[in-house]
Amino acid sequence: MFVLYINDLKKTLTKAQLNLFADNTVIYVICDSFRECYEEMNDELKVFADWLKLKKLNVNKTKCMVVTTRSRNDCNGVVQIDGEIVERVDAIKYLGVMLDEMLNFNEHVNYTIRKAARKFGVLCRINRYLTFDNKVMVYKTLIAPHFDYCASILFLASKQQ
């Protein structure tokens, strides 16, 4: 039902690209200059804020973030939504994948390794109490899914990772 409610959003934004999945929305622009990107994004976010008001929806401003693929030194603009500045971050988690400003997925690889290592630590602590079959089941249940989800990204890991 929610998808039907927000289906016209794609037609509302003219300069920005939009990715929708369930209640997750990503709005992004691709431009040649940094100034142009900030201008287009701010223009589109004004349209987006008006659309939200029309639909009687609120944006969760604590989950709004800006990631750019340029160095911080090149970036001195601000993105605003409904008069509030949107936080600029180095990486975001989107649908379980860490996206960083370099788009090299190092952040995601490290994030996946940390999550799996914590679960492996649990397995090591209870190791002596489990049969071989139970160990395999715990591995397949707790650890393997971290490597299976978006596995193709993990192939981008550097040799030291």
Question: Residues of each region from the PLM?
Answer:
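Catalytic palm subdomain of template-directed nucleic-acid polymerases
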Residues: V26-K53, R70, N104, L156-K159
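Non-catalytic, peripheral interaction segments enriched in hydrophobic/basic residues
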Residues: T14, F21-A22, K53-R72, Y94-Q161
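Short, conserved non-catalytic motifs in the polymerase core
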Residues: M1, Y28-F34, V79, G83, ...
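Short beta-strand/turn micro-motifs at beta-sheet edges
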Residues: T14-A16, E84-I85
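Short, conserved micro-motifs composed of acidic
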Residues: D43, L57-D90
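Conserved pre-motif C helix in the palm subdomain of viral-like polymerases
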Residues: M1-K15
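Hydrophobic alpha-helical membrane-association signature
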Residues: M1-Y5, M41-E44, T112, K119
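Beta-strand cores of modular interaction/reader domains in eukaryotic scaffold and signaling proteins
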Residues: N19-F21, V26-Y28, N58, Q80
